[in-house]
Structure formats: structure tokens, C-alpha cells
Design a protein with these regions (language model features):
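Sec-dependent bacterial lipoprotein signal peptides
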Residues: 1-19
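An acidic-aromatic pocket/loop used at catalytic or ligand-binding sites
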Residues: 21-205
């Protein structure tokens, strides 16, 4: 994803004849791209991997949970696109624990409550009450969204359990993946959408 994003923006800059385009790529010890930064006079995109923690998302780490570091995941991702007043920001990090999913769900329901009402979603449908937050966020919001950086997919899969809090524009999500090796796996996502983006409008932002 990072290489494609950088290539696209550089191509746009050259096609438009924009002066002052700057591209910076940091690589890891094995040559993998750890971050890509493309800056232009009218905006840019910054992508970082393996540098974000739960605290950066405004959430605590479940006690004893470990960052997922298998081949299917970066440990975390931080994606920022900004073009004038149009800005999109996604932060994501994945963890696993030997504790049960129910224990993790209970922990994050309490942790997410700092952002207001917490809704429980299964397959984009609400489970129990409330069915939407006081700021208008529902289980339908973001039903087609995926957070993927390279081979690392932070989506929790169709039909899996998610906890959500916030508004349509500013969301905090804890989603649960299928268990692996007897461990509960979950991803935390902080999502900030630009004003006017389809699905992000509403009385509250």
C-alpha cells in the first residue's frame, strides 16, 4: 500500500507540473518499507508501520496482551492523508491474549465508554442496546471499510464482533478476529473521516 500510494501521488504531482514535491521512504533492517512520506504544496500522505501503540489511539492495552507480529500483520499502522481542509486519519494496532473473548469485550466496553455510548455489532447489525451512539454512530457505518497496509489486514472479517464508540466522523473501534492458536485476537482502530465524506455527515462530528 505504501509504495502504491507514494507512486500515485508522485505521478499526480508530475502530471500537474507541481514544483516542490518531496518523497521520503524509511526502510527496516530487512528492506521493508516502514514509512512513506509524500509532501506537495497542496497536500500529502504519510504512512507509518510498527510505530503506533494503543495509547496513540487513546485506549489502554488489555492486561498481558501481546502485539501480533506474525507474517499476516504489521504490529500497527498510522495513515494520514491531507489535502487542504480534507483530512483522513486511520490508526490501527493488533493484539492477542490467552484470555477469553468475553473478558476482552468487557474490558474494552468499559475503556471505550470514555468516548460516550458503546455499541456492539455483529455482521453490521446491533447486538443488544444501545443500537446507536448519542452522536449517531451505528453498526452500518464503515461496513465496507478495510484497513490494509501491505499484507497486514486490520479488518476483523465479515460477521465478526465489533465494539464502537464516537460519531460518524470520529470513531474508536475494537474488532475481534477469529481465534488463532487458542488466543483471542483483536484490532483497535481510531478513525477520523473528513467532513462531507459519504457516511460521515450528521448533526454531530
Amino acid at each position: 500500500m505504501m509504495r502504491e500510494a507514494a507512486s500515485l501521488l508522485v505521478g499526480l504531482a508530475l502530471a500537474a507540473g507541481v514544483a516542490g514535491c518531496r518523497v521520503h521512504v524509511d526502510k527496516g533492517v530487512n528492506g521493508e518499507e516502514k514509512s512513506v512520506q509524500v509532501d506537495m504544496p497542496f497536500g500529502g500522505v504519510h504512512v507509518k508501520t510498527d510505530q503506533t501503540t494503543a495509547a496513540d489511539l487513546g485506549l489502554p492495552v488489555y492486561p498481558g496482551a501481546q502485539l501480533i507480529t506474525d507474517n499476516d500483520h504489521h504490529k500497527s499502522a498510522d495513515v494520514h492523508l491531507g489535502f487542504g481542509e480534507w483530512e483522513l486519519r486511520v490508526k490501527a494496532v493488533s493484539y492477542s491474549t490467552a484470555d477469553s473473548r468475553d473478558q476482552v469485550v468487557a474490558f474494552y466496553k468499559k475503556a471505550l465508554s470514555r468516548y460516550g455510548d458503546v455499541i456492539t455489532c455483529q455482521g453490521n447489525a446491533p447486538v443488544g442496546m444501545p443500537t446507536q451512539t448519542s452522536e449517531g454512530l451505528t453498526c452500518e457505518e464503515g461496513k465496507n471499510a478495510r484497513v490494509q497496509v501491505g499484507s497486514a489486514d486490520y479488518s476483523t472479517g465479515k460477521g465478526n464482533l465489533e465494539l464502537k464508540a464516537g460519531s460518524k466522523r470520529h470513531q474508536h473501534i475494537v474488532g475481534f478476529e477469529n481465534p488463532k492458536n487458542g488466543k483471542t485476537r483483536f484490532a483497535m482502530v481510531a478513525l477520523d473521516l473528513p467532513a462531507g465524506l459519504q457516511g460521515s455527515s450528521g448533526k454531530s462530528d
